[in-house]
Design a protein with these regions (language model features):
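Compositionally biased terminal segments of proteins
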Residues: 1-223
């Protein structure tokens, strides 16, 4: 598992250098107008699972199309890519880089940090998991549930609850989806090697129940 973590961090270092070069040199998007978030940042902060993908959230979308392999000489080296209205996804043997048109969904702003030998803006943990509920909570991605449960059981529980209070419609969709699978359900078999098993939280197999508890706590605050 340790060798897997080292390999992951090395490929992510390569990936962030690629994305930085793409953004700064080709798309002309200033580094103050994009941030790194998603499971990779949570992995670095909580060490709760492995994450091999890089998520770059672009707030200034004026030059977003410049990240496309159709227009970007560096991006065209990707083995495979997908484009949608709000995203450009580049796949490499080492992992995937997702560029996403996104806006801030909480009051927790990105901060400048030294990550993978780069000074970049990094999304706050609360913003990361709130985005997961806002943009795709109803889809019940197993990794999202595990991330949410991890943050909820951590020291920033009240901050997460307060952030979700401000997105009641998306929270309701998330809650309804959880109710459809029901208490006691687990996605644990879907994780494979994505989990780091030596953490003391003991949440593997309980992630759905923990997220239901989270929703119930937020809903009580809305009454």
């Amino acid at each position: 598992m340790e060798s897997e973590r080292i390999r992951t961090e090395l490929l992510l270092e390569k990936a962030i250098k690629i994305t930085s070069f793409l953004i700064l040199e080709y798309a002309n998007i200033d580094n103050s107008q994009w941030s790194m978030g998603g499971g990779t940042i949570l992995m670095l902060n909580y060490h709760h699972r492995l994450s091999k993908d890089v998520d770059i959230f672009v707030s200034n979308t004026q030059y977003f199309n410049g990240l496309s392999p159709k227009l970007n000489d560096v991006a065209e080296d990707a083995d495979f890519y997908q484009e949608g209205e709000r995203f450009i996804s580049l796949s490499y043997p080492e992992g995937k880089i997702d560029f996403v048109k996104a806006f801030q969904v909480s009051d927790y702003l990105p901060t400048l940090k030294h990550v993978f030998n780069q000074n970049i803006f990094v999304d706050d943990d609360i913003e990361i998991v709130t985005k997961k509920v806002f943009f795709r909570g109803a889809s019940l991605h197993p990794r999202d549930l595990y991330d949410l449960a991890t943050v909820y059981l951590g020291p920033r529980r009240s901050e997460l609850v307060n952030a979700l209070i401000n997105i009641p419609e998306q929270l309701q969709e998330f809650h309804d989806a959880l109710q459809r699978v029901g208490p006691g359900f687990s996605f644990s078999e879907d994780y494979g090697l994505d989990l780091v098993l030596d953490i003391p939280l003991g949440l593997k197999g309980r992630e759905v129940d923990i997220c239901i508890d989270l929703c119930n706590e937020v809903r009580k605050s809305l009454v």
